[in-house]
Amino acid sequence: GQSLFIDGGTTNEAIARAIPRDIELTVATNSLGVASVLSDHPLVELIVLGGRYVRDLGTCVGADTLAAVAQLGADLFFLGSCGLDATRGVTAFDSSEAEVKRAMAGNSAGILIAVTNDKLATTAPYRVAAAGSISHLVVEKTAPAAILADFERQGAQIHFA
């Protein structure tokens, strides 16, 4: 089966809930919420990436998390985005969280980001990945076409949820 990194956030928890119970996957996550959702999926090999737990984020970060990520590779990274801008790329509000996201992105063959309209064309202080590194962008049907065109020009495949 396919291997995935899934980091934290409410959107990624919703994605985890949508994963069918009869699909064979390996999922590595630093999110306790995602781990909890997938814990009863019998065909999912679940790898929980430990480290310093940040309650506000619901994720583990820090040296232990980074060391675990360094030992793994994924076919696809479901990246939770705080901000997404065609010029600044993917950004996060927490430096430790951004560091883990960068490590996951660097060890993944592709990056998928699912965002709501309120995160499009916004930025946070810490850079995670360039817009051109996004393989798949999942957006609402009402997402502004001009913004989506900027991401398409940089190589992202656009999908409507």
Predicted regions: what they are:
Residues 1-21, 25-30:
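Helix-turn-helix/homeodomain-like alpha-helical modules used for DNA recognition
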Residues 32-161:
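Conserved phosphate- and dinucleotide-binding cores of soluble alpha/beta proteins
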